[in-house]
Amino acid sequence: MRYFVYNHHDFWQWEDSNSELMDSEVVFMWSDWPFRNEVKTLQSMGKKVIVYEHGFGALFDYELNNRDFIADGYLALGDESKESLIRAGVEPRKILVTGNPIYDDIKKSKHTGNEALYVALHWVRDVRYYNQTVFEQLKGAYPQFNWTVKLMEKTGKMVANKKWISNSDGNILEEIKDRLPEYDAVFTPRPSTFESIARLMGIPVYVVDQEQSYKDDGEPELMPLNNTYLKIGEKLPRQKKINMDEYIKRPSLSLDLILDWTKTL
């Protein structure tokens, strides 16, 4: 079967496209509602459009933010994403729980040292002051840690002795898997795909802004999760239990099985 892939932040981890867009029978996209006209055009040409979950919790967007579902089918990371889509109104037959190969080989290990990583907020607007303020508060409250700041191109500059800087257009997920085991605790205002990898590795994740004070009115709601929230200055709490098997299927399905499923739509 001929298929074409729109990759996004390297999250499509199956085989690359085996045809050009115009020759394809199936088109895998990272979302549909922002590209309504393109999706409709592709469907009018007889192509099936399939949306894959392009980050941890991404498919919750339909339920939480009332997005239109236009694609022919959806590939969910786990059962929780599938159930969210069903609550949003997507027919169960149009949802396949696939996992993602990027998660398949992650193993849990012990992390008892003092290397801490602050994963700074990367946002569509300038949040440099917010990031720097939170980082300074963390350093002051928890001096027992050696601190590193995790930055991306959308984060903006920060003042820190140690930085880990990534480019979302590069092979960012493999980079995260390679380097993240160096750290013993992760602190962030907003958990995302990065923190899902940390949790699978057994690294404690502390969410430092339960009130989401960085958000402006009208900005999208985020996926609900049993996060371990930390009020900066208080003793580090015990990690709350999250059954990651409910959110990420492992091992992931093969592309052959996914393509066979598209024939049923």
Predicted regions and their residues:
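Conserved catalytic-core segment of nucleotide-activated headgroup transferases in glycan assembly
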Residues: 4-5, 103-161
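Nucleotide-activated donor-binding/catalytic signature segment of Leloir-type glycosyltransferases, i.e.
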Residues: 157-174
